[in-house]
Amino acid sequence: MSIRFQKAAALSNFSRYNPNSGRGFYESYFIRANHPKDPKAFWIRYTLFSPKSKPKDSIGELWVIYFDGAEVFSSKTEIPWSQCQFPRKQFSVQIGDSYINNVVAKGQSNHLQ
């Protein structure tokens, strides 16, 4: 893989959110995995939501979904913007204690239903 391609791929993951724009904004990053043999899967989504003309009301949302082969369990947690990071110069998203970057992802919920 060329260095040019690697740089373009990295840049494509940087957040595009500009809190000074006043425009509404929605951006998501996610990771999912399926068990290779059993009908099991999980999905974790890290989302930034900023309502139009109200950047002070921006929040981070952590969505967690788990399928055990018979049932689907899900949760959505809203986190205050003060506990979130969506940098524009690197791929390192954080929502509360959950995060995703080029190397690792962590997301958990104690509210699966």
Language model features by range: what are they?
Residues 1-113:
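Targeting-peptide/extracellular-domain and disordered-appendage signature
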